């Protein structure tokens, strides 16, 4: 969005203008009787806007059974490999025709790199982390960060929990993925939340986005589309995921938007999202409040973490003046 402000990219630009290889993506058209996938060219070009809104067609294998099946048939590495090969999987639908949460924002990262001429981590350090004082954020851990790293834990079907001692993302990723892969602290991420609450300005006064850009990022840009439930296609990574089931939700240029007041007290128009290891945050510009619940537990939508997060949020709203 900083590049949009600067006039260096347009939201309706074809993404291939900046990342030519995205034009090679194909659409999954089903599987034959032997289970072999069939693909076809997309009916239109992918735009920058569609990537930001998760309507370009990219998915995540742990949220889509057909994409997981395709990856198994074609030996496509998981996105956690932070590889270009994982990003070149297949589209789940024609661009602009449906909402599908996936590696769309990873491709946004490639657009940013192409325009800035730098790796995404360097751009984020210069233009987000340093101005906001986020000294514990990055795609690789400093010695200080490593000394304080919380271990990933796995929840068993019986409810027990054990540390995953060998679970660590590569410290030299082939790709800096725009949609995942950062290390950070809750304190650092709350500086980002405060920036959004402060209309683009950090707590020390550094402006990273214009207030009108924050406005644009926090309103529905999906039109009549609504976001959908995310199936848990890889049980070790995610359960089925839907926030406030049955309540209409839309999407802006960064976050999910609840279109009605949530049971916690979060008002219509507030934004929120989550990360796979059961990290959840929300931003309520109307009431000038936001929060984050953070764990290092898999699979996503943990049966204890989600209720705890919702109780936490409700307590916040119950005590607002």
Which sequence ranges carry the predicted segments?
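Short, small/polar residue-rich loop motifs at catalytic or cofactor-binding pockets
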Residues: 275-277
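Short, surface-exposed loop or secondary-structure junction motifs
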Residues: 17-265
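Short, hydrophobic/aromatic-rich segments at coil-to-beta transitions
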Residues: 264-272
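Surface-exposed amphipathic alpha-helical segments
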Residues: 306-321
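Short, well-ordered beta-strand elements
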Residues: 280-282, 288-298
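A short acidic/glycine-rich loop-to-helix N-cap element
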Residues: 298-308
């Amino acid at each position: 969005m900083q590049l949009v402000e600067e006039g260096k990219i347009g939201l309706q630009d074809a993404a291939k203008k900046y990342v030519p290889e995205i034009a090679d993506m194909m659409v999954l058209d089903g599987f034959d009787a032997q289970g072999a996938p069939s693909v076809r060219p997309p009916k239109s070009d992918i735009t920058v806007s569609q990537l930001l809104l998760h309507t370009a067609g990219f998915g995540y294998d742990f949220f889509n059974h057909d994409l997981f099946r395709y990856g198994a048939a074609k030996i496509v590495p998981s996105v956690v490999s932070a590889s270009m090969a994982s990003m070149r999987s297949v589209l789940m639908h024609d661009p602009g025709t449906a909402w599908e949460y996936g590696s769309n924002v990873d491709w946004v990262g490639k657009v940013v790199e192409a325009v800035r001429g730098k790796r995404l981590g360097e751009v984020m350090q210069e233009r987000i982390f340093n101005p906001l004082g986020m000294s514990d954020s990055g795609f690789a851990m400093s010695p200080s960060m490593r000394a304080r790293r919380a271990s990933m834990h796995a929840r068993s079907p019986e409810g027990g929990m054990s540390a995953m001692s060998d679970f660590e993302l590569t410290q030299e990723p082939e790709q800096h993925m725009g949609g995942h892969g950062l290390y950070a602290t809750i304190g650092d991420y709350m500086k980002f939340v405060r920036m959004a609450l402060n209309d683009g300005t950090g707590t020390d006064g550094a402006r990273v986005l214009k207030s009108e850009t924050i406005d644009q990022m926090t309103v529905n840009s999906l039109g009549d589309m609504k976001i959908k439930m995310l199936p848990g296609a890889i049980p070790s990574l995610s359960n089925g995921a839907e926030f406030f089931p049955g309540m209409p939700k839309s999407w802006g240029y960064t976050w999910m938007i609840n279109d009605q007041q949530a049971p916690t007290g979060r008002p219509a128009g507030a934004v929120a999202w989550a990360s796979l290891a059961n990290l959840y945050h929300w931003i309520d510009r109307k009431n000038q409040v936001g929060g984050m619940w953070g764990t290092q537990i898999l699979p996503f939508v943990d049966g204890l973490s989600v209720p705890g997060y919702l109780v936490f949020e409700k307590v916040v709203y119950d005590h607002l003046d």
